[in-house]
Curated annotation (Swiss-Prot):
InterPro entries: NTF2-like_dom_sf (IPR032710), Rng_hydr_dOase-bsu (IPR000391). The keyword Oxidoreductase applies. The gene is bphA2. It comes from Pseudomonas sp. (strain KKS102). This is Biphenyl dioxygenase subunit beta. The beta subunit may be responsible for the substrate specificity of the enzyme.
Length: 193
């Protein structure tokens, strides 16, 4: 990807997710929301292997670093794709993260964090590619660890979902996590969004 293309893609992140010209059917909206609720449940109950099965082989899981800018530099609010990021993962690196999370030697998560993933404001768009959807959703992730450590992460996820015969109806092909915080005060980012 050229620098110009990366800059354009990054500038698109600050734009609101466009509403579809035609709303999707209530049935499809319901299916997508139910998928997200089940995904949140898997994460909150530390069922990481089942969650990993929801990721497509060509997954791109990306959380760009957000910076605070003045209005005229708003298009530079996110660090460009291909540069540093909180997460910039593919299927293999996500497998490594899951392996680490489920290991008994994972000190960052021993004892386990208690999390609650809340997903709302789900906007679904159909695409020209069959069985593929673009979805935006708002999230709030609450984490309590040890006795007094509390972290709250808020933001927007922009996903590409593909139809799948996996009992939940979809798999995640792309996830871009647009976190609201420019400075993350948590001790670590050992949670999935």
């Amino acid at each position: 990807m050229t620098r110009v293309a990366m800059a354009q893609k990054t500038a698109e992140l600050i734009q609101e997710f466009a509403w579809p010209a035609q709303p999707v059917s209530p049935q499809l909206q319901h299916e997508v929301e139910q998928f997200y609720y089940r995904e949140a449940q898997l994460l909150d109950h530390h069922n990481y292997n089942a969650w990993f099965d929801l990721l497509e082989q060509d997954i791109h899981y990306w959380m760009p670093i957000r910076t605070t800018r003045i209005k005229r530099e708003n298009d530079k609010e996110y660090i460009p794709a291909g540069a540093n990021a909180h997460f910039d993962e593919n299927h293999e690196t996500m497998r490594g993260r899951i392996r680490q999370r489920t290991s008994e030697l994972n000190w960052a998560e021993d004892p386990l964090s208690r999390t609650r993933h809340i997903v709302s404001n789900v906007i679904v768009r159909e695409t020209d590619t069959p069985a593929t959807l673009e979805v935006a959703s708002a999230f709030l992730v609450y984490r309590n660890r040890l006795e007094r450590q509390v972290d709250i992460f808020a933001g927007e996820r922009r996903d590409v979902l593909r139809r799948a015969n996996n009992g939940l109806g979809f798999k995640i092909a792309r996830r871009t996590i647009l976190i609201d915080q420019s400075t993350i005060l948590a001790n670590n980012l050992s949670v999935f969004f």
